[in-house]
Swiss-Prot record:
The lineage of its organism: Bacteria, Pseudomonadati, Aquificota, Aquificia, Aquificales. This is tRNA-2-methylthio-N(6)-dimethylallyladenosine synthase. Residues 142-370 form the Radical SAM core domain. Its EC number is 2.8.4.3. GO terms for molecular function: 4 iron, 4 sulfur cluster binding; metal ion binding; N6-isopentenyladenosine methylthiotransferase activity. Disulfide bonds: none annotated. Its main location: cytoplasm. Monomer. It holds the Pfam family UPF0004. Residues 373-433 form the TRAM domain. Catalyzes the methylthiolation of N6-(dimethylallyl)adenosine (i(6)A), leading to the formation of 2-methylthio-N6-(dimethylallyl)adenosine (ms(2)i(6)A) at position 37 in tRNAs that read codons beginning with uridine. The gene is miaB.
């Protein structure tokens, strides 16, 4: 039997898909390279915005055609959209065999047994399952041999008014620290060099178990063989001085941080229930820059939140120009069911949102181009993750992709690279030294 998984959305979904692959392979499934060749197709969905929902509905329409050609193929839907609207999906798409949410991935073996005997398996848990941590002990099939996602917590307590995550992922639950350290040790033993800690709000890790995030960073840093540590995503209000000091002091912390600010206007931030101000966010950035040499930033921005004025938008542009992010992920606001903002009037036209996002991206393009040119003729540490043709591909400690020329096999190695060319999205360079 063969499976095919299509993953939408964030790093958490990617890691969940890696867990699902591991479960499937323990059940005797092998990976297929195409949906058409699979006995089981699973869509791991995202519902953070309206657009991912639309993509899933469209994809399900295509899969319906596939099922009409091959009635024996089994179709599954999981992830955040399934958690939010799983019963609706099952009702509208009766050809779907399997639906489960974000809180019961570990139930897959039982659900698969139901599907194998011809039953539909539809299970959406409203409450967190105390046994969900067993998922952390399941085998994981990773696409990257040298960089690995490690889930350290699930859920979010922040209750931002636009965000569906508290509904789809539940309350914050920190994973047992020893379980995390054991997984990291196992990954390093298998050849992994970079540990990427993930969660809906990793900087809130440990609040429910009296084990602060900075302490977890310190203990992971001590594990022999961990070359790099990065984490995604944090919340500015939880980016404490202790975390910043720890990041600055650990030799294997990367000097890049993704820190969403969402909007620059204090009025809009209050409506979003972000619980910080523009000044507070800029203070965190200033402290990080002062403590961590050459640190770079990326961020998320929502454009056109209800009642956003031109003056509000100018505050957002001011943050972008002040911080000088290397990368910005910007999105037009779209109301999501099960959020407080769903009941606010979406009073900005699509034309206004499109105009503002275009202006933002024009400013960001100039900033990125300027920052990328600073890499030219410098030597950067790069962890080599892939090879395409004769070119090796890796990332700098500042999270920039680099295409590398080398006469030696450097796959899976950390190398020093002399940057010869700086493009808009990547660098080109030649190996100077293998570390």
């Amino acid at each position: 039997m063969k499976y095919f998984i299509k993953t939408y959305g964030c790093q958490m979904n990617i890691n969940d898909s890696e867990k699902i692959k591991g479960i499937l392979q323990t059940q005797g499934y092998e990976p297929a390279t195409r949906e058409e060749d699979a006995d089981l197709v699973i869509l791991n969905t995202c519902t953070i915005r309206e657009k991912p929902d639309q993509k899933v509905w469209s994809h399900l329409g295509e899969i319906k055609k596939l099922k009409s050609i091959n009635p024996n193929i089994k179709i599954g839907v999981c992830g955040c959209m399934a958690q939010r609207a799983g019963y609706e999906i099952a009702s509208k798409m009766p050809f779907i065999d399997l639906v489960f949410g974000t809180k019961n991935i570990h139930h897959m073996p039982k659900l698969l047994e139901d599907v194998k005997v011809g039953n539909r398996a539809i299970e959406i848990l409203e409450e967190e399952d105390p046994s969900e941590n067993i998922l952390d002990s399941y085998p994981t099939v990773r696409d990257n041999s040298y960089c690995a996602y490690v889930t350290i917590m699930r859920g979010c307590d922040k209750e931002c008014t636009y965000c569906v995550v508290p509904f789809t992922r539940g309350k914050e639950r920190s994973r047992n620290p020893q379980s995390i350290l054991d997984e990291v040790k196992s990954l390093v033993d298998s050849g992994v060099m970079e540990i990427h800690l993930i969660g809906q709000n990793v900087t809130a890790y440990g609040k429910d178990i009296d084990y602060p995030f900075y302490k977890l960073l310190e203990n992971i840093s001590k594990i022999e063989g961990v070359k790099r540590i990065r984490f995604t995503t944090g919340h500015p209000i939880d980016m404490t001085d202790d975390i910043i000091e720890t990041m600055a002091n650990l030799p294997n912390m990367v000097n890049h941080l993704h820190l969403p600010f969402q909007a620059g206007s204090d009025r809009i931030l209050e409506l979003m229930k972000r619980n910080y101000t523009k000044a507070y966010y800029l203070n965190r950035i200033e402290k990080l820059k002062a403590k961590i040499k050459d640190i770079t930033f990326s961020t998320d921005i929502i454009i056109g939140f209800p009642t956003e004025t031109e003056e509000d938008f100018q505050h957002t542009l001011d943050v972008v120009q002040t911080v000088e992010f290397e990368q910005v992920f910007s999105f037009k606001y779209s109301k999501r069911p099960n959020t407080p903002a769903y009941y606010m009037e979406d009073d900005l036209t699509d034309e206004i949102k499109t105009d503002r996002i275009k202006r933002l991206l024009e400013i960001q393009k100039a900033i990125t181009s300027k920052l990328m040119q600073r890499y030219k003729n410098t030597v950067q540490k790069v962890l080599v993750e892939d090879k395409k043709g004769n070119t090796y591909i890796g990332r700098t400690t500042t999270n920039v992709w680099c295409n590398i020329t080398s006469s030696q096999d450097i796959l899976g190695k950390e190398v020093e690279v002399l940057i010869a060319k700086a493009g808009f999205q990547s660098l080109d360079g030649v190996v100077q030294n293998i570390l």
